[in-house]
A protein has these predicted regions:
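Non-heme di-metal
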Residues: 1-118
């Protein structure tokens, strides 16, 4: 795999996105087609549902690539709440701190806080 070399993050994300694309456009589509032909409608439905999930994965990877290439992983246009995934420290700003002031973990531990529980 990769001649023993470890690819960079963007290359890994591109490979992952391509893999997800093949899964939702070819693999699960073909599985669903065969299941329908064989009269397994429920199984065909499940394969189609999984294909939609794989499509979402591809889109997520492509958005991550875009964020890395545009330098927006840790920089947003407006102020947002960032949460440290190690200790839970919350920081409000366009960027998270370089080092968490509570647990001293690096910036890579921060992500934009989701508020899907409200």
């Amino acid at each position: 795999l990769n001649g023993g070399a470890i690819p960079g993050t963007i290359e890994n994300l591109k490979d992952a996105a391509a893999g997800e694309n093949g899964e939702w456009t070819k693999m699960y589509a073909e599985f669903a087609k065969v299941a329908k032909e064989e009269g397994f409608d429920r199984i065909a439905y499940l394969f189609e549902a999984v294909a939609k999930i794989e499509k979402e994965h591809e889109e997520r990877y492509r958005k991550l690539i875009e964020n890395i290439e545009n330098g927006t992983v840790f920089e947003k246009d407006g102020e947002v709440y960032w949460i440290c995934q190690n200790c839970g420290h919350i920081h409000k700003g366009k960027t998270p701190p370089k080092i968490c002031p509570v647990c001293a973990h690096p910036q890579g531990y921060f992500q934009v806080r989701a508020e899907n529980y409200k």
